[in-house]
Amino acid sequence: MARGRKMCKPRAVEAAAAAVAATAPGPEMVEQRGPGRPRSDGENVFAGQSKIYAYMSPNKCSAMRSPLQEENSVAHHEVKCPGKPLAGIYRKREEKRNTGNVIRSAVKSDEQKSKDTRRGPLAPFPNQKSEAAEPPKTPPPSCDSTNVAVAKQALKKSLKGKQAPRKKSQGKTQQNRKLTDFYPVRRSSRKSKAELQSEERKKNELIESGKEEGMKIDLIDGKGRGVIATKQFSRGDFVVEYHGDLIEITDAKKREALYVQDPSTGCYMYYFQYLSKTYCVDATQETNRLGRLINHSKCGNCQTKLHDIDGVPHLILIASRDIAAGEELLYDYGDRSKASIEAYPWLKH
């Protein structure tokens, strides 16, 4: 069985290692500057030695370590800080933080004031924090006058930016107008049942009595006799009755054949349908009634209408529009046959 050899360090080597460890510099910072390399303004050069301690038992001394191990445990680190000194940088950072805090506190106080003014003198909610009661934070004494001026300018800009949309909204509210400013209010022109019944009674009285008021006979150029309004008629008003003999169609055809034989007689016959039957009002015979003398026009101011009284139809004329005094009364005869137009050319107009 072979025996192994144990290698031991000579005592001279251990002594040399102890001497090197004793003369090595400590962990404090030492400024190093090589020849020909002066320190520039604003540049801080530090050469620090960070000593790495090996995990050793407290019984072992530094003399037991080899010189190679001692050299490896020491490292030189050179730190360069170009630019301004560190103290100035730290001071500027603190000033920026202080100004930011001042701006935030001022903006918060203004927002709280605006909320309070909108809310009015109402009592605050129980869970709400009373931020408005707290006074605004004053800038710390470390801030100089320039920082305070910058904070005020920033606060003014923020307030202007918030007030601008309010002005726009106020302008919009001022421009809002009612719909009635552009369109008039439309009121119903319908008449009540009582009003309609009273009008029907008046028409019945006028028709049965035969009164014809508000008109007169006058000579019209190119037409002969005509009827002129002597008072104002409103739209829908009763004007006059087309009065004559009410006959059925069979009797009307016989009379019409007789009237054709005498050209000087003329034709004043008006045909209409009532309850699925055709009737005719013959006003050829000369009377003092004015309805038979109203002339024809396609753009007249009157129109015919049937009015029933006790089951008997009456042909009446009502105003199709407002009629002024002195205006001629006209209505459309409604005859478009070729024979009638050839006999009476004025029916075209």
Swiss-Prot record:
<keyword id="KW-0539">Nucleus</keyword>
<feature type="compositionally biased region" description="Basic and acidic residues">
    <location>
        <begin position="192"/>
        <end position="207"/>
    </location>
</feature>
<protein>
    <recommendedName>
        <fullName>N-lysine methyltransferase KMT5A</fullName>
        <ecNumber>2.1.1.-</ecNumber>
        <ecNumber>2.1.1.361</ecNumber>
    </recommendedName>
</protein>
<dbReference type="GO" id="GO:0016279">
    <property type="term" value="F:protein-lysine N-methyltransferase activity"/>
</dbReference>
<keyword id="KW-0131">Cell cycle</keyword>
<keyword id="KW-0949">S-adenosyl-L-methionine</keyword>
<dbReference type="InterPro" id="IPR001214">
    <property type="entry name" value="SET_dom"/>
</dbReference>
<feature type="modified residue" description="Phosphothreonine">
    <location>
        <position position="138"/>
    </location>
</feature>
<keyword id="KW-0156">Chromatin regulator</keyword>
<feature type="compositionally biased region" description="Basic residues">
    <location>
        <begin position="154"/>
        <end position="170"/>
    </location>
</feature>
<feature type="binding site">
    <location>
        <begin position="223"/>
        <end position="225"/>
    </location>
    <ligand>
        <name>S-adenosyl-L-methionine</name>
    </ligand>
</feature>
<keyword id="KW-0489">Methyltransferase</keyword>
<feature type="region of interest" description="Disordered">
    <location>
        <begin position="65"/>
        <end position="207"/>
    </location>
</feature>
<keyword id="KW-0808">Transferase</keyword>
<feature type="domain" description="SET">
    <location>
        <begin position="213"/>
        <end position="334"/>
    </location>
</feature>
<dbReference type="GO" id="GO:0043516">
    <property type="term" value="P:regulation of DNA damage response, signal transduction by p53 class mediator"/>
</dbReference>
<dbReference type="GO" id="GO:0140944">
    <property type="term" value="F:histone H4K20 monomethyltransferase activity"/>
</dbReference>
<keyword id="KW-0158">Chromosome</keyword>
<keyword id="KW-0132">Cell division</keyword>
<feature type="modified residue" description="Phosphoserine">
    <location>
        <position position="57"/>
    </location>
</feature>
<dbReference type="GO" id="GO:0042054">
    <property type="term" value="F:histone methyltransferase activity"/>
</dbReference>
<keyword id="KW-0678">Repressor</keyword>
<keyword id="KW-0597">Phosphoprotein</keyword>
<dbReference type="InterPro" id="IPR046341">
    <property type="entry name" value="SET_dom_sf"/>
</dbReference>
<keyword id="KW-0498">Mitosis</keyword>
<feature type="compositionally biased region" description="Basic and acidic residues">
    <location>
        <begin position="107"/>
        <end position="119"/>
    </location>
</feature>
<feature type="binding site">
    <location>
        <begin position="295"/>
        <end position="296"/>
    </location>
    <ligand>
        <name>S-adenosyl-L-methionine</name>
    </ligand>
</feature>
<dbReference type="InterPro" id="IPR051760">
    <property type="entry name" value="KMT5A"/>
</dbReference>
<comment type="function">
    <text>Protein-lysine N-methyltransferase that monomethylates both histones and non-histone proteins. Specifically monomethylates 'Lys-20' of histone H4 (H4K20me1). H4K20me1 is enriched during mitosis and represents a specific tag for epigenetic transcriptional repression. Mainly functions in euchromatin regions, thereby playing a central role in the silencing of euchromatic genes. Required for cell proliferation, probably by contributing to the maintenance of proper higher-order structure of DNA during mitosis. Involved in chromosome condensation and proper cytokinesis.</text>
</comment>
<dbReference type="GO" id="GO:0018026">
    <property type="term" value="P:peptidyl-lysine monomethylation"/>
</dbReference>
<dbReference type="GO" id="GO:0051301">
    <property type="term" value="P:cell division"/>
</dbReference>
<feature type="region of interest" description="Disordered">
    <location>
        <begin position="18"/>
        <end position="46"/>
    </location>
</feature>
<dbReference type="InterPro" id="IPR016858">
    <property type="entry name" value="KMT5A-like"/>
</dbReference>
<feature type="binding site">
    <location>
        <position position="268"/>
    </location>
    <ligand>
        <name>S-adenosyl-L-methionine</name>
    </ligand>
</feature>
<keyword id="KW-0832">Ubl conjugation</keyword>
<dbReference type="GO" id="GO:0005634">
    <property type="term" value="C:nucleus"/>
</dbReference>
<dbReference type="Pfam" id="PF00856">
    <property type="entry name" value="SET"/>
</dbReference>
<keyword id="KW-0805">Transcription regulation</keyword>
<dbReference type="InterPro" id="IPR047266">
    <property type="entry name" value="KMT5A-like_SET"/>
</dbReference>
<keyword id="KW-0804">Transcription</keyword>
<comment type="similarity">
    <text>Belongs to the class V-like SAM-binding methyltransferase superfamily. Histone-lysine methyltransferase family. PR/SET subfamily.</text>
</comment>
<dbReference type="GO" id="GO:0000122">
    <property type="term" value="P:negative regulation of transcription by RNA polymerase II"/>
</dbReference>
